[in-house]
Amino acid sequence: MSASWPPEFITLNPNKRVLFLTKDLQLIKDQLYNGLNLNMCDLSVDDLLDDINTDVMTPAWVCFDHEPAVIAENAYAGLLHEGERVFNSGALKDGGFEVIVSGHRKGTGSSRETAPQCERWSGIRIVIAASFAPIHERNNINLGQVMGDHQMLERLQSGESIPLAEFTEQYDPVTRLILENGGILPFAKKLKAGEIELPAVSTERRGMTMAEKIVANKLIGRNGAACYVSPGDAVLASVDGGYSHEFTTAQVHNFLAAEYGEDYALPNPPKFAVFEDHLLYATGVPRFGPFADKIQTLRDLQVAFQQHTGVRDYSAKDGVSPGICHQVAREEFIDVG
């Protein structure tokens, strides 16, 4: 990811374009293929698509690819008009867009991270909507995408430079730091290097629930001092364990290698794991046939990740999975006390 993003002031690039996802799908086609450029001042929010689903942005078959640049080739492959794709392969990436605009509740549906990736790796860095689905908003934050509203877009299209702080002021202090440093991976790398100082937790001594005590005991940056947390505090806590599965492990492997180098390592590998449970029965299913090679690549890269990191291996044995990741993690990963 670019070390210079985001800048202190957000300004539109005169050589880039703004794509409006309108309810009139022909207008989208005209922007993609006929050079039509629109302005927010000539439209209303009611003209824009609401409830854009993450399955529309990256249908399940697109997720058989794991490299974001390849995923971007099929951005919005699920948006159909009379049975035909509105976005042909490469249409978003080839359109020269840096801003994408929609209506209410952008990113409903599944939580898949590939949805904002398809925009980010198509050149989109500014995402405009009246509102965002919460998980989709967080996934955009983790990629360092700048999100704003339609009034901000009107100002940008009129030539104004808007301070980054106006885009981030709605968030808590930790989230602002993540955005201001380009997303979760560059933020985490700088935090580990001591280049970022987390805001102090100001909660005074108080009675806490068990969950609050666990979070307080795992706060990053407390340096052994007794800390207290309360609802609403923005904090970062160390995670003792985690897992991934075939649909996500390849991306984890690639992102960590890109950010930390090919020799990256995980802390406490025995508390992390990979599961073979999502694509276990994909082999031999006719509708998965066209994606058989990609599915096998996902499996192979999960094996490579496990061998590289030394995390727990919950691969299938003789075609039988050890269990569903969500359930096994609850049963086997938690240490009492």
Residue ranges and their predicted role:
Residues 1-337:
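Fe-S-dependent hydro-lyases/dehydratases of central metabolism
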